[in-house]
Amino acid sequence: MTRPQAILTDIEGTTSSISFVKDVLFPYARRAMPAYVREHGNHPQVRHWLNQVADEIGEDVPDEVLITTLQTWIDEDRKHTALKALQGLIWGDGYKTADFTAHIYADAAIQLKAWHAAGIPLYVYSSGSVPAQKLFFAHSDAGDLSGLITDWFDTEVGPKRESASYRRIAERIGVPGPEILFLSDVIEELDAAKRAGMRTALLDRREDYPTPRSADDVGSHQRVESFSQLVL
């Protein structure tokens, strides 16, 4: 097998632990959401996303209702673009004030640097907003890794479990699907990428998945427990 022309990676459960997102980022955004909306609700960018939330629930409602809705969506882990954008803005404040740094697995940081040094373009596709992705990599445990990434994609390119999203990404980066390796911990995402013609690898980390996924579940995807095990 020839080396891929590009590598596309997920974040949560792939480069980084699920627990960091669930136990640090989500609760931080939930706690900060009321004060953030009250303080910044008239800012055009914030209002744009709040209006999208109002459109989603189909009512002209006060901000307090929008705040409650957003907190409920956080609890439900909704992949709504407006929620992800607002979370990203809030996390930006947290990174800037050093309330936390983003978790990156050591093997992921090492391998991303090695691939970048070898001239393989790296791309990120996550349900988190592009600004949030950039902040995540810029303020990681391993330092500023944002310069390793050529481009970033979020759910504005499409849902992660639909093959059309991966075809759009391939078109945008100008690399044929079979020459792109997609890394994720979610089998349904890998299935969608494979239907779009991409190579795929399942990250099945014991820290995030104590019970290994079965061979039937993994199917034809390459399965690894760390980036160091990946075969290009």
UniProtKB/Swiss-Prot annotation:
Q: What is its EC number?
A: 3.1.3.77
Regarding protein family, the annotation reads: Belongs to the HAD-like hydrolase superfamily. MasA/MtnC family.
What function does the entry list?
A: Bifunctional enzyme that catalyzes the enolization of 2,3-diketo-5-methylthiopentyl-1-phosphate (DK-MTP-1-P) into the intermediate 2-hydroxy-3-keto-5-methylthiopentenyl-1-phosphate (HK-MTPenyl-1-P), which is then dephosphorylated to form the acireductone 1,2-dihydroxy-3-keto-5-methylthiopentene (DHK-MTPene).
Query: Which terms are listed as keywords in the entry?
Result: Amino-acid biosynthesis, Hydrolase, Magnesium, Metal-binding, Methionine biosynthesis
Q: Which reaction does it catalyse?
A: 5-methylsulfanyl-2,3-dioxopentyl phosphate + H2O = 1,2-dihydroxy-5-(methylsulfanyl)pent-1-en-3-one + phosphate
MF-aspect GO terms: 2,3-diketo-5-methylthiopentyl-1-phosphate enolase activity; 2-hydroxy-3-keto-5-methylthiopentenyl-1-phosphate phosphatase activity; acireductone synthase activity; magnesium ion binding
Protein name as annotated = Enolase-phosphatase E1
Q: State which pathway it belongs to.
A: Amino-acid biosynthesis; L-methionine biosynthesis via salvage pathway; L-methionine from S-methyl-5-thio-alpha-D-ribose 1-phosphate: step 3/6; Amino-acid biosynthesis; L-methionine biosynthesis via salvage pathway; L-methionine from S-methyl-5-thio-alpha-D-ribose 1-phosphate: step 4/6
GN (gene name): mtnC
Native organism = Xanthomonas euvesicatoria pv. vesicatoria (strain 85-10)
- Stored PANTHER family: ENOLASE-PHOSPHATASE E1
Mitochondrion recorded as keyword: no
Q: Is Amino-acid biosynthesis one of the keywords?
A: yes
List cofactor names only. Answer: Mg(2+)
The free-text note explaining how the cofactor binds reads: Binds 1 Mg(2+) ion per subunit.
> Which residues are the signal sequence here?
none
Q: Which GO terms describe its biological process?
A: L-methionine salvage from methylthioadenosine
Domain of life of the organism encoding this protein: Bacteria
List, alphabetically, the Gene3D superfamilies matched.
1.10.720.60, HAD superfamily/HAD-like
The enzyme class is hydrolase
Q: How does it assemble?
A: Monomer.
